[in-house]
Structures are given as C-alpha cells and as structure tokens.
C-alpha cells in the first residue's frame, strides 16, 4: 500500500504542474461580432459578462481584470436541431405523404423561433412566440403529429467560484429541514450539494453572493404517420440575476416578518449574458481544456450519523467538521489578454512560439502520465503475484462436478449437469486461466479453490449462468448444501441489492416467485442466493420455436443452456397444430399472472417484467417464476401510485415499458399490466412482439401502433391483450381480472360458462325490452357472421328440429341449443355423439371452431351486466380452470 500511495503521489506531483503551464487564451475572430453585438457599451467598459456556449457551458469574464474567473458546465446543450433527409423515403408517395409542404421549425441567430414553409413556390420564415406556440400543441393531422414541451430550471451558483449550490427542476424539487434552537429553518442545499453555507450564518456578510441562472428550454418535434421523426428543434434561453445579501437571509432562515403571500427570494441585479449558438466551450477557449476546474483531493465520507427514534424518524447527529472540508489544488490563474479586444470586435494572433511551446508541454505531460500509470500497474501486478496459494476448504459441499462433453452430430461440446439444472457451455482454456488470475488478484477471494470460492455459508462456483447490466453476474453455487443460483452484484450497487432482497423477503414462499435463501458479501461483491432454475422464458420460447420450425435445430439448443428441458432432442409442446397455446404454455402464462397478482397484493410494482426476467423450473411439470426485482418498488401504504421521485428515469427495459414509463409520468400497478401484455404476446407467437422489432418498439409504444394480427385467430387473446396494451393505464384490467380471463379457461370451464349464460339469458323477457338481451343480440353480426344453421352439419340440424323451432340469427337460441345438447349428451344418437366429439374437449371444439367469437362476446356482455351476480362469481372470483 505504501508503494501504491507513493506512486500515486508522484503521478499527482508530475501532472499537477501542467495545470500552471498554460497562461492566456485565444478566441477566434469568427465569434467577435456575435459577442460584441449582444453586449452594451457600459458592460464592455466595466463589470462582468457571462458567456454561454452551445454545449451549455457558462463562463464568467471579469472585464476589469481581463480574466476568466470560472466556468460551469451544465452538460445540457442550449441548441440542437434535426431534419430528416428526403432520400430516406424510398418512393415518391412516401416522400410526399410524409414531408408534405416541407414545413419545419428552427430558431435564428437571435434565438427567436420561426416556422419555415413553402408558399407559392417560395420559402417563407415567420417568427413565432415559442411559449404561445407550444401552448397550442399537440397538433395532429393525417400525415403528421407535432409535439412540444417547455421546461424551466434554475441553477444556483456561487458567484465567486462558480460552484453549483442547487439545481431547481420540477422533477427534482424537494425540501430538507434541520432543527436548531427548537425552530425549524429551511435549507436550500440538498444532501448531495456542496456544503457552501448552512444554517449557522448569522450576519449578511457571512453569506456568499449567489447568481441565479434562469433557463427556459423549448422542445418541438414533428413525427410522420410512419413513426419517423421529420424534424426537431431544442433550444434554451438563459438569463442571470445576482442575489444580494438581504435576500439570502430569507434562504437560510425565514424571518417572522415575512408574510404568507411574500416570495422570499428577490432579485436585485441582472448580469449581462451572451449565448453563442454555434460555438463550443473548447472552441471559444481552446487552450483551457481540462483546466477550467480545480483539482480536488479525495475527502472523507461525511454522511451524517443517524439514529432511528420514535416512530421511525431519524435524528441527525453532528458530523465530523474536518470531513466537511473539501481540499482543492489552486486553480491556475488564466489571463485572457484579449478579452477586451473580443468585446470590441478585434483579436490578436498568438505567436508561433507560444503554440509550439504549448504543444511540447502537452506531449511531455502525456508521456509522464503514461509512464506513471504503467509503473503503478506493474507494481500492483507484482504485489498480486506474491499472494499465497488459496486455502481449500475441507467442509463438504455440493461442488459442481465436471462432466465430459458429448457431441450430437455437428454440435459443439455440451455440458450436462445433475438434477437437470443448467450449466455453462464450453470454455476456452485461456478464459479459465483468466478466471483463476482474477480470483488471485482480489484479496477477498483468497479462500478459493479451483472450482470456486467460499463466502460465509455460500460456495460460489466459477460456472457462469448469465450476465446482467452494471457488472452483475449470475453463477452456480451452493448455499448450506443446496444448489442455488448466485447473483453477484458489485458493492457500488448496494442499494439495488438491498431493495431486491427486501422485496424477495416480502414476496417469498409464493410458488410463482423465485425463492430467496440468503445473502452474503465480501470486500468487493454482494451475493444473493436464489432458487436455481432451468432457463428463462425467453430461452424456452425461442428454442421451442426453433424446434417447431426445424427438428434439426436441437443441435444448437445448448447455446441457450436449456438441455434438461429438451430430452432426446424433443422439446415440450407449447403450441397446438392450429398455432394456439397448448395447455403447457397456458399454465406457464397463468403462472406469470399469478406471480404478478401476488406482488400487487402485497404492494410491489415489478417495473421490469420481460421474458428474460421470467425463469422456468422443471419438476414434475414446468413452472414459471418472476425474478429480478432490483428496480421494483413498494407502494406506500393506502396508495395506488408511486411518488414522482420514486418513479425514476430508466425504470424497466426498452421495448417492454409502458408509455407512462417512457414519458416518466405517474406510474401505478398498470405499468406491469402493459408489460404483461407484451410478454403474453411473446409467448403465444413464438417470440414476436406486438410493437415490432427492437429498434422501433419504444416509438410504436408511444404512438400506440401495435399489431395483433398474429393472434387474430384467437379472439380471447385479442380481447385480453387489447385491454392490457391500452395506452390509458386507467383502462387496463387488474392482474386479478386477467387471472380469470377466458383465455386461460379449459374446455370444461368454457362449456360450463356457455351453459350458465344460457340459463341466465332465458330469465330475460324478450317482449319487455331487456337491456341484457338487446346487448347480447347486438353482437350477432360479429359472433355469428350470418345464420348459425349454415355452419352446422345437417345431421345435427335434423336432430334439433325434431323438438322445437329456433331462430337461426339469434345468439340466445344458439346458446339454448348448446345447453340442451350438453345436458342430454348421453341421450343423443351414437353417430351424433361421434360428430360432436367427447365431452368436454371434443364437444367444445365442435362449436368453438364454427363460432370462434361466441365465448368472448357472450363473456363481455355478461361481464358488463351480471358481474355482481352470484352465478358469475364462479368465473370472476374463483380460480377454477
């Protein structure tokens, strides 16, 4: 450690003088006029000027001393625009329908929004007010949609240093309070903000001067009917205002004299500000580069000590005062010798000698830096080699055994494992050697063996099952003698791990949630021991679909590690010959819904439901289980939606997110229902997606452009998915309702419902104008598609005609026929029984094949009119399939 620290110090001392070797700055003549035209004569003679470049950087220039005082990088550009090229469209019809009259919008050099269109063969630019125009949006037509948005934000900076004190945005606002002298004082700073001042200031001169950078962002986008972005423009207008000392007192502690209707912040002095649309910070100050900020030494963790008191409130104890100090190296004093000339509209060229000397210093600094880094690397490598041989534990554990590989035709070697669980495929010898070196390099892994290493009660194998994002890896392992999947997360993601553990504990012991056994950690990683599963739903569907298309595809199944499910090269039957889901697939789909029902019942929103996060376990039958709840959220008590701060950007996976997730809007349990619709479609179609290919899914989700053509032969699926994929989250069904949807009913349940529906409809009096009966018969055109007698066999019609007469255009009479023949099936002639098939499968298939929409149409009507009646509870409240 001493050698490492010494090398770090040498590296720092060698590099730090480079910061002092750059003096002066040059600004190209090309930008002189655009700056000087925006500055008044009085501002050019004295005072300060703030210069903002297109990348969002803000620099303070002191006119009296001709120095660049500081630069603050917002990392948010103040201007960007895009226009789709005409040649993007392959046909003249597409080009004309999409581009129309070549209308687009942009902002000019004076930061004024204008619309540009062709009128009478000439292009005309018309200045418009951005705020008023956005207020009229959205605009929709047959060939385009124009969307707009206006955001406001404020950056509170220390006037002297340019350091960020606080950023105010609508999606980030929250307050923080402390207690002092039994009085509550408001603190502007958040926990993450630099501690520039706090509640201890008593005099106005103790407060730093603050500058408020007010920013207004305008965003406008035009989208074609094909979902393509035709053009977009985003730009910002910024103003700066300097805060006086008296106003700052209102920030630190509200005075009792301030009335309820008074706004405590009053601006006093405006600071001139210049916005350069086509200039980047590096272009304006080409020789400053990385020297625009001070170099900071590492500081200690200054998180306040907290004690839980009372009903869970936290008492914040005073932290270490020394830890609050942030040490920094002095920022080099950069003299901008030409700043006066810039404002006046003229510049001087730097000499060749100055440029050449600067280049030499850069090359020298780069060489010294690389040599120092290489020296540090080889020193640490040498230290790692000195580590003793790892200790091999003698405790008997279920260590995965190596199996000889076997080949199937042209297939590469495939590893099989006991108990039908997955294992890694072939590994390159060099890769295995690298793994051993990795274990040796980490001091925390000293107690490792050739097969893996032990952490507490957990033995972690070197066999990798899967990889996740942000360094997360899933490995095989053993926890107290039980085979488990070990989810290894880096320590920096401790919050994600803790959240997943808490949610797993809350949802544990449900048959459709992955079991959690324990958690361990070492210096580098957190290890979560989970139930070991055979594969993911994603792998199962793709492999089964490949086998369905070509039986020879079994030779490549090992690539997705699901060999145990496919015995003798044969996969499980997930689809019937007609393409409809098999009972096995329907059970897996029900398992997913059941797991989601359980999570929602205990107040957990998964937020990342997708085929990769549904795992398959093979026991006596296949079972689906929900997993990977690292970004799931617990709903607060007595609430149905997540708070604004807890929704979070980036929740979920691209292509599987609800539109409100993509827009970062209010999120409820309904976000999981939308993802569920996509997952169910994925299952029924053998790996397809209702919103198209990967690159276009999110755009299609936002535009509600789904395609359910592949499941049109299954009306129950169309009905369910149309509800689940509704863009309005309030109109999506609950998970509990999905659980009882007719899509998941077996043949016995379907026939039982049609029989009970007929009994219920018979109670209605046709002559009294029954609303239920009228609603049912109104669906005849869709349900029957003509007369129902035209779709039945003559032998069947002869049999029913012997007893009574029927109306062949009435759904009520068709239900009566089905009910009567089902009740008297044993009394039917043998040839008619053979025609109808056995009860329930054959009998139900006879009618559903001729009237595929009968069940869902009758269900929809009775759900609306009889949902609260006792006979209907069997189909909407109980889980009978």
UniProtKB/Swiss-Prot annotation:
Cofactor(s) needed, names only, are: Mg(2+)
Q: Where is the signal peptide?
A: 1-21
Induction comment: By ER stress inducer tunicamycin, by salicylic acid (SA) and by bacterial pathogen infection.
| Xref: PROSITE patterns | KEN (PS51392), PROTEIN_KINASE_DOM (PS50011), PROTEIN_KINASE_ST (PS00108)
Maturation and modification: Autophosphorylated.
Q: Which GO terms describe its biological process?
A: autophagy; defense response to bacterium; endoplasmic reticulum unfolded protein response; immune system process; mRNA processing; positive regulation of autophagy in response to ER overload; response to salicylic acid; RNA splicing
Q: Where does the UniProt entry place glycosylation sites? A: 115
All ranges on the Lumenal side of the membrane: 22-357
Please describe the organ and tissue distribution of this protein's expression. Answer: Ubiquitous. Detected in the apical meristem, at leaf margins where vascular bundles end, in the anthers before pollen is formed and in the ovules at a very early stage of development. There is no expression in more mature embryos. Also strongly expressed in the cotyledons immediately after germination but not later on.
Region entry ATP selon article: which residue ranges?
Answer: 481-502
Q: Which SUPFAM superfamilies match?
A: Protein kinase-like (PK-like) (SSF56112), Quinoprotein alcohol dehydrogenase-like (SSF50998)
Q: Which UniProt keywords apply?
A: ATP-binding, Autophagy, Disulfide bond, Endoplasmic reticulum, Glycoprotein, Hydrolase, Immunity, Kinase, Magnesium, Membrane, Metal-binding, mRNA processing, mRNA splicing, Multifunctional enzyme, Nucleotide-binding, Serine/threonine-protein kinase, Signal, Transcription, Transcription regulation, Transferase, Transmembrane, Transmembrane helix, Unfolded protein response
UniProt xrefs under PANTHER family: IRE1-RELATED, SERINE_THREONINE-PROTEIN KINASE_ENDORIBONUCLEASE IRE1B
How does this polypeptide assemble, per the annotation? Homodimer; disulfide-linked. Dimer formation is driven by hydrophobic interactions within the N-terminal luminal domains and stabilized by disulfide bridges.
Name recorded for this polypeptide: Serine/threonine-protein kinase/endoribonuclease IRE1b
Q: What is the lineage of its organism?
A: Eukaryota, Viridiplantae, Streptophyta, Embryophyta, Tracheophyta
Could you tell me the gene encoding this protein? IRE1B
């Amino acid at each position: 450690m001493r050698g490492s620290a010494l090398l770090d110090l040498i590296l720092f001392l060698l590099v730090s003088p480079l910061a002092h070797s750059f003096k002066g700055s040059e600004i190209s003549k090309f930008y002189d006029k655009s700056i000087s035209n925006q500055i008044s004569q009085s501002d050019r003679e004295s005072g300060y000027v703030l210069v903002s470049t297109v990348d969002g950087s803000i620099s303070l220039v002191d006119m009296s001393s001709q120095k660049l005082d500081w630069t603050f990088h917002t990392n948010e550009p103040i201007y960007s625009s895009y226009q789709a090229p005409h040649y993007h469209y392959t046909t003249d019809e597409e080009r004309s329908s999409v581009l129309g009259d070549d209308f687009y919008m942009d902002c000019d050099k004076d930061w004024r929004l204008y619309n540009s269109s062709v009128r009478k063969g000439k292009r005309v630019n018309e200045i418009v007010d951005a705020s008023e125009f956005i207020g009229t949006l959205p605009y929709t037509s047959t060939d385009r949609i124009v969307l707009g948005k206006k955001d406001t934000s404020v950056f509170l900076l220390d006037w002297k240093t340019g350091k960020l004190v606080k950023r105010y945005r609508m999606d980030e606002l929250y307050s923080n309070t402390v207690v002092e002298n039994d009085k509550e004082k408001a603190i502007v700073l958040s926990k993450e903000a630099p501690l520039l001042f706090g509640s201890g200031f008593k005099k106005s001169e103790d407060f730093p001067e603050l500058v408020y950078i007010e920013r207004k962002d305008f965003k406008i986008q035009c989208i074609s009917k094909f979902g393509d972005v035709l053009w977009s423009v985003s730009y910002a207008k910024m103003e700066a205002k300097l805060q006086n000392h008296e106003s700052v007192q209102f920030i630190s502690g509200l005075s009792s004299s301030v009335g309820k209707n008074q706004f405590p912040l009053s601006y006093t002095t405006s600071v001139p500000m210049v916005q350069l649309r086509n200039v980047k910070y590096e272009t304006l100050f080409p020789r400053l580069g990385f020297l625009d900020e001070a170099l900071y030494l590492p500081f200690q963790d200054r998180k306040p000590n907290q004690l839980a008191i009372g009903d869970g409130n936290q008492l914040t104890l005073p932290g270490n005062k020394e830890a609050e100090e942030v040490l920094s190296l002095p920022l080099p004093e950069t003299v901008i010798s030409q700043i006066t000339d810039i404002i006046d509209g003229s510049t001087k060229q730097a000499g060749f000698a100055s440029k050449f000397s600067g280049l030499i210093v850069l090359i020298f600094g780069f060489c010294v830096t690389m040599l120092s880094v290489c020296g540090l690397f080889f020193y640490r490598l040498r230290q790692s080699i000195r580590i003793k041989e790892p200790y091999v534990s003698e405790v008997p554990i279920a260590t995965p055994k190596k199996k000889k590989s076997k080949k199937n035709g042209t297939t590469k070697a495939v590893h099989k494992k006991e108990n039908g669980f997955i294992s890694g495929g072939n590994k390159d010898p060099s890769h295995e050697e690298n793994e051993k070196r990795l274990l040796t390099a980490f001091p925390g892994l000293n107690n490792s063996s050739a097969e893996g290493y032990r952490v507490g009660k957990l033995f972690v194998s070197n066999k990798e099952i899967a990889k996740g994002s942000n360094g997360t890896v899933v490995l095989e392992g053993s926890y107290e003698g039980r085979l488990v999947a070990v989810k290894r997360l880096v320590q920096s993601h401790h919050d994600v791990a803790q959240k997943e553990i808490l949610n797993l504990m809350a949802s544990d012991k449900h048959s459709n949630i992955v079991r959690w056994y324990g958690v361990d950690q070492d210096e580098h990683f957190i290890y979560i021991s989970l139930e070991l599963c055979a594969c993911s739903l994603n792998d199962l569907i793709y492999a089964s679909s490949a086998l369905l298309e070509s039986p020879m595809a079994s030779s490549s199944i090992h690539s997705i590690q699901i060999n145990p499910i496919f015995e003798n090269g044969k996969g499980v039957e997930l689809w019937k010959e007609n393409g409809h889901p098999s009972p096995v697939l329907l059970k897996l789909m029900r398992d997913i819904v059941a797991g989601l029902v359980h999570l929602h019942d205990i107040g957990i929103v998964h937020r990342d439901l997708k085929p990769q996060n549904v795992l398959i376990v093979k026991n006596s039958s296949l079972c689906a289980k929900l997993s990977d709840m690292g970004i799931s959220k617990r709903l607060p008590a007595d609430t149905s939606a997540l708070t604004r701060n807890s929704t979070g950007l980036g929740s979920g996976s691209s292509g599987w997110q609800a539109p409100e997730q993509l827009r970062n809007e209010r999120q409820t349990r309904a976000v999981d229902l939308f993802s569920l619709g996509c997952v169910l479609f994925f299952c029924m179609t053998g790996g397809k997606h209702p919103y198209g290919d990967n690159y276009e899914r999110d755009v299609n989700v936002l535009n509600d452009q789904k395609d359910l053509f592949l499941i049109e032969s299954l009306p129950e699926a169309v009905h369910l998915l149309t509800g689940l994929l509704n863009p309005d989250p309030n109109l999506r069904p609950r998970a509990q309702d999905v659980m009882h949807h007719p899509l998941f009913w077996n043949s016995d349940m379907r026939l039982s419902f049609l029989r009970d529906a007929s009994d219920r409809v018979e109670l209605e009096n046709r002559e009294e104008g029954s609303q239920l009966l009228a609603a049912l018969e109104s669906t005849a055109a869709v349900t029957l598609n003509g007369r129902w007698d035209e779709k039945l066999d003559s032998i069947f019609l002869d049999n029913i005609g012997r007893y009574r007469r029927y109306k062949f255009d009435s759904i009520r009479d068709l239900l009566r026929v089905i009910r009567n023949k089902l009740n008297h099936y044993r009394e039917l002639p043998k040839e008619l029984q053979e025609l109808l098939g056995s009860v329930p499968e054959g009998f139900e298939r006879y009618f559903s094949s001729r009237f595929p929409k009968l069940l869902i149409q009758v269900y929809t009507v009775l759900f609306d009119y009889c949902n609260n009646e006792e006979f209907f509870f069997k189909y909407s409240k109980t889980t009978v399939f």
